[in-house]
Amino acid sequence: MSNLGKVIQIIGPIIDIKFDSENLPDLFNALEINAGDRKVIAEVEQHIGDDTIRAIAMEDTEGLKRGMEALDTGKSVSVPVGKEVLGRLFNVLGKPIDGAGEFISEESYPIHRPAPSFEEQSVEPEIFETGIKVIDLLAPYQKGGKIGLFGGAGVGKTVLIQELINNIAKEHGGLSVFTGVGERTREGNDLYYEMKESGVLEKTALVFGQMNEPPGARMRVALTGLTMSEYFRDQGQDVLLFIDNIFRFTQAGSEVSALLGRIPSAVGYQPTLATEMGALQERITSTKNGSITSVQAVYVPADDLTDPAPATTFAHLDATTVLSRSITELGIYPAVDPLESSSRMLDPRIIGEEHYEVAIKVKNILERYRELQDIIAILGIDELSEEDKLVVGRARKIQRFLSQPFTVAEQFTGMQGKYVPIKETVRGFKEILEGKHDNIPESAFLFQGTIEDVLKKAQQMEI
């Protein structure tokens, strides 16, 4: 027998509905409100008194009015999962929004699910090879880890994300789920068509809850993407989950919290900030079956890293990849800052002594070069000691060797993309540090894959 209630109050996206006190819907249950020509889905957030619930709408509340009937579905919002979701674009409710025809899925999962238990989780730290030299060498990713991607507008976040999707699909046979949380619709549109052109779309599912949507949708869309990822992980796959932008998840939660009448916490954020973030992040993990590696773009409000939203996010991250405008100005891409980026995987017990030593030496030489730049700017390079001149020469080669042509950018750069295994990356930088390539001009190191590519380029330059 269907459990029906009546809408008694609507304040923006918040809807109060009266049910029979014997049949009050459970928290997080999905409700269907019949608004004539369409059904509006809302989620139960609070019980008020004996017979009234307060729900947050997942869709626009335009056209709703008091007295309308609301049906308790008896379960939380469920979204389609399985290989059918690949190559398609969904909203928070798992409905396709790409206009690419009918969609039929055999299975669906509820978006509210428990995190894997301790017994199910994999505890062995394992490197996730990206094939991108600067990341693999200096700030390696953990399989099943969480990575924060920091960078302003136009420094190459999207291209880096696309290259990661491309590399996991082609080199590891892995899948990706891209979740757009509260970002610009135009950017999502661009990403969709760029992915289509570069051929990575069929290995990716996209879920969008953009900034024009109600706060309920923006708060839950990250869970929709995560649920699709969990299915693939449980099937033994390695999945890449992109969340762009994790700050908007917190922001939407703050809006919902205020609308529900909760007393705000520090800087006006919701009092449940850490709990909400933990509930999402704890589900992103490796199990004995497969892994979910998450790359999360992090917007830092007013560049204040102590703001509660980014500060709460930091507690969960295993690695940070910082994209820097000063590096894009040098014409070096990917514009990853080798000194600002960090990873807890940079440990000799995990990556091995050789890799660790090479990474630390590369960081040291780049740090020394940064210190010398002021002297060079004032006095010129000729005033440096012979030892410092050698350091500068090698640092400039290392800086250029950290650049790399990307497969997804081939149509723009005209250069063939390169995937570089970690062993080759470590060997290449070790040889530069040992001075084996001191005689090669630094321009030969720019946009090359392995050290062999550099030697080939140097030979061509001599001809």
Swiss-Prot record:
ATP binds at G151, G152, A153, G154, V155, G156, K157, T158. Signal peptide: none annotated. It catalyses: ATP + H2O + 4 H(+)(in) = ADP + phosphate + 5 H(+)(out). It is found in: Cell membrane. Keywords: ATP synthesis, ATP-binding, Cell membrane, CF(1), Hydrogen ion transport, Ion transport, Membrane, Nucleotide-binding, Translocase, Transport. Its main location: membrane. It is a peripheral membrane protein. InterPro entries: AAA+_ATPase, ATP-synt_VA_C, ATP_synth_F1_bsu, ATPase_a/bsu_AS, ATPase_alpha/beta_chains, ATPase_F1/V1/A1_a/bsu_N, ATPase_F1/V1/A1_a/bsu_N_sf, ATPase_F1/V1/A1_a/bsu_nucl-bd. Coiled coil: none annotated. Pfam families: ATP-synt_ab, ATP-synt_ab_N, ATP-synt_VA_C. Its EC number is 7.1.2.2. GO terms for molecular function: ATP binding; ATP hydrolysis activity; proton-transporting ATP synthase activity, rotational mechanism. Gene3D superfamilies: 2.40.10.170, Bovine Mitochondrial F1-atpase, Atp Synthase Beta Chain, Chain D, domain 3, P-loop containing nucleotide triphosphate hydrolases. GO terms for cellular component: plasma membrane; proton-transporting ATP synthase complex. F-type ATPases have 2 components, CF(1) - the catalytic core - and CF(0) - the membrane proton channel. CF(1) has five subunits: alpha(3), beta(3), gamma(1), delta(1), epsilon(1). CF(0) has three main subunits: a(1), b(2) and c(9-12). The alpha and beta chains form an alternating ring which encloses part of the gamma chain. CF(1) is attached to CF(0) by a central stalk formed by the gamma and epsilon chains, while a peripheral stalk is formed by the delta and b chains. Produces ATP from ADP in the presence of a proton gradient across the membrane. The catalytic sites are hosted primarily by the beta subunits. Belongs to the ATPase alpha/beta chains family. This is ATP synthase subunit beta. It comes from Clostridium botulinum (strain Hall / ATCC 3502 / NCTC 13319 / Type A).
